[in-house]
């Protein structure tokens, strides 16, 4: 019997990143989603194409050997697949983890496989697998919780690959950048050993990789998006052609680099080279990366452990400079009432209806006595005065 992976999330990251490498590693991939259109399309097609984009051109890969299940209508089938799978992965968004936990918990509970299930959440969030693990424990009978480690092992991961705006007529095919990084902690697998998945870089300590990625790639990308959007630039490439915006991105990443170098003992020269590589990647004209796509979901991106407040809070606690990060926060606060982005409308409502203090607390979860709080409050007050 061959290897099997169940993947929650039939979107672009699921098909064009996780699914691609599971397929290349010899797994049959079972996609699980609640979107009828995605599942119907996957069930009808025997393959789809992933197109990797780089400065050298395009490279196409055909993905086959997969199935798809609609968890909205066939949840029992999903549970059965999990019970006999080798790996479960997900790319659904951090807010959806609590909804996929119950079927995973049930699938784990009825497992009879000798080897524990490997569970890896592939989300843009720190400790996403730990979060999912907590929800799974909550959905496991108390009498069975102590034996959960014998049936499943949970490893956090950091993923990095840009998926630009897709052609609306592309169907299941995915256009994606050639560069990727998928780092997963190996310690949770112990003597059993980690699953054999191509592309994964297995490490003992994941935190430096997660924070370096989140506070460089995601912070830089979002900074370019918000400054670009407010300056009327259509794409990230166009935004970074503007010297004013490029210098703002560099200033923000100089601040986050100071944190990464000091906290994780990464050599300054290595971090500098990493930053330059990231700026080159996100400014790739072939990606046609639209600023609205990169800036979407501003409430999540302004939250406590995310790409702006996360590093800024740590820097403020260390007494270090956060001027450029606060400039990026101001631009993010202006990302309001953007078509097809529900959170941007909610942001407008919060800034319009709440006091500056209440809005600051709601958006960032910072306590008033935190050293970063007054800096954010100042930006919220300023944007509120400009918001109509």
Swiss-Prot record:
Gene3D superfamilies: N-(1-d-carboxylethyl)-l-norvaline Dehydrogenase, domain 2, NAD(P)-binding Rossmann-like Domain. NAD(+) binds at residues 5-16. Keywords: NAD, Oxidoreductase. It comes from the Eukaryota. Pfam families: Mannitol_dh, Mannitol_dh_C. It catalyses: D-mannitol 1-phosphate + NAD(+) = beta-D-fructose 6-phosphate + NADH + H(+). One of its GO terms (molecular function) is mannitol-1-phosphate 5-dehydrogenase activity. GO terms for biological process: mannitol catabolic process. Its EC number is 1.1.1.17. Disulfide bonds: none annotated. GO terms for cellular component: cytosol. The active site is at 213. Catalyzes the NAD(H)-dependent interconversion of D-fructose 6-phosphate and D-mannitol 1-phosphate in the mannitol metabolic pathway. Monomer. Belongs to the mannitol dehydrogenase family. This is Mannitol-1-phosphate 5-dehydrogenase. The lineage of its organism: Eukaryota, Fungi, Dikarya, Ascomycota, Pezizomycotina.
């Amino acid at each position: 019997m061959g290897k099997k992976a169940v993947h929650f999330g039939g979107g672009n990251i699921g098909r064009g990143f996780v699914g691609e490498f599971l397929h290349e590693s010899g797994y049959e991939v079972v996609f699980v989603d609640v979107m009828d259109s995605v599942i119907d399309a996957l069930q009808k097609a025997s393959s789809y194409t992933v197109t990797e984009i780089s400065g050298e051109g395009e490279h196409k890969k055909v993905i086959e050997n997969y199935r798809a299940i609609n968890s909205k209508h066939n949840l029992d089938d999903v549970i059965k697949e999990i019970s006999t799978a080798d790996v479960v992965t997900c790319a659904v968004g951090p807010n959806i983890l609590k909804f996929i936990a119950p079927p995973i918990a049930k699938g784990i509970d009825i497992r009879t496989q000798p080897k524990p299930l490997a569970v890896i959440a592939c989300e843009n969030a720190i400790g996403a697998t730990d979060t999912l693990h907590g929800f799974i424990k909550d959905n496991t009978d108390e009498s069975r919780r102590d034996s959960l480690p014998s049936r499943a092992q949970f490893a956090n991961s950091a993923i990095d690959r840009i998926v630009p705006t897709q052609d609306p007529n592309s169907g299941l095919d995915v256009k994606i950048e050639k560069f990727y990084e998928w780092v997963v902690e190996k310690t949770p697998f112990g003597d059993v050993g980690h699953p054999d998945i191509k592309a994964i870089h297995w490490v003992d300590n994941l935190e430096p990789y997660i924070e370096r990625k989140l506070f460089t790639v995601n912070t830089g990308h979002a900074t370019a998006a918000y400054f670009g959007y407010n300056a009327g630039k259509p794409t990230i490439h166009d935004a970074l052609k503007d010297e004013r915006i490029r210098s703002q991105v560099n200033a923000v990443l100089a601040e986050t680099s100071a944190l990464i170098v000091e906290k994780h003992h990464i050599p300054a020269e290595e971090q500098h080279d990493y930053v330059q590589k990231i700026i080159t990647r996100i400014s790739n004209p072939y990606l046609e990366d639209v600023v609205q796509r990169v800036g979407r979901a501003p409430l999540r991106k302004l939250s406590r452990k995310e790409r702006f407040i996360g590093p800024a809070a740590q820097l403020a606690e260390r007494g270090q400079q956060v001027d450029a990060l606060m400039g990026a926060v101001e631009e993010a606060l202006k990302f309001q009432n953007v078509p097809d982005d529900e959170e941007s409308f909610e942001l407008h409502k919060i800034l319009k209806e709440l006091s500056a203090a209440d809005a600051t607390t709601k958006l960032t979860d910072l306590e008033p006595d935190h050293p970063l709080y007054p800096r954010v409050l100042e930006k919220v007050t300023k944007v509120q005065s400009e918001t109509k």
